[in-house]
């Protein structure tokens, strides 16, 4: 029986449309703010309000799923995201845009929690890696296509908002034709995010999501700046970023399959080691293409494998809470990593971007090498 059931395929189709909209807005909002002559610190504050919304949305979505189920939570999340999009055209100004991006951030985080939790609850310990790999492939493909859309269509605010809003609403349609069962509502005991974060046997998965956030946040946010400082033109920067993201897309399926077959612990060790090698290779600047490719293939696949590791260690009814904890951990890492790396780059050297990535990866590798007690029969086996 295929792991890609009808509900899973429809869920991923909806996610693709929503991710396209997210990618377009995340690229154009800072440009719209700059065109409005807002100072850089205000542009940064609007971006921060979006990520703050991500944190807030992550915290309460589990409760929402338990109360109204996956489908209705997904509809509500999409409508909140659409409202945050429409608001940008209704009210113009720093404070109003901060508010609307905060609302959009809540909606986006809710979408991620709902989709990831639904996929984990649909799978088993034997195929969850492949399900999460498919999720990440769709997510990165949507991000990639969103960047292409930005380069091909008009970037005017009032030209973009109508079709982006329509795309968000179209993302609701696939789930109108299926129902995703929430087995958590039948559980006697609910789990909290804090309890999942404290769970000793899942700590490597939580730490892996933090490290993944640091690595990806730093690469996404600061790699273009690093390349710019190397004297590259915008077209060249776009090419190398495409290489990085493409490697992440291509690496998802093999890593997910290997993790299901040989175990997540072994695959995580190999991934982290390859991230370290890729970072060191970037410092030499001798072979940027293979260095960026292996860095993208290993770095962009850390998150789903770490998620699958953590989800092996909990009961089935705890999967939604665990997913919230993992997404929260990733978000914290993606906020801290670029901030710290940017400070190092500004005050010392651009090369410290890769030294930092290699250093945090090495610390995580030591944690993985210390763990020799991988559970042969995972708890979440159903």
UniProtKB/Swiss-Prot annotation:
Pfam families: MFS_1. PROSITE patterns: MFS. It is found in: Cell inner membrane. InterPro entries: MFS, MFS_dom, MFS_trans_sf, MFS_YcaD, MFS_YcaD-like. Residues 1-7, 66-74, 123-130, 178-203, 252-269, 312-324, 370-382 are cytoplasmic. Gene3D superfamilies: MFS general substrate transporter like domains. Residues 29-44, 96-101, 152-156, 225-230, 346-348 are periplasmic. It comes from the Bacteria. Keywords: Cell inner membrane, Cell membrane, Membrane, Transmembrane, Transmembrane helix, Transport. It is a multi-pass membrane protein. CDD domains: MFS_YcaD_like. The chain crosses the membrane at residues 8-28, 45-65, 75-95, 102-122, 131-151, 157-177, 204-224, 231-251, 270-290, 291-311, 325-345, 349-369. This is Uncharacterized MFS-type transporter YcaD. The gene is ycaD.
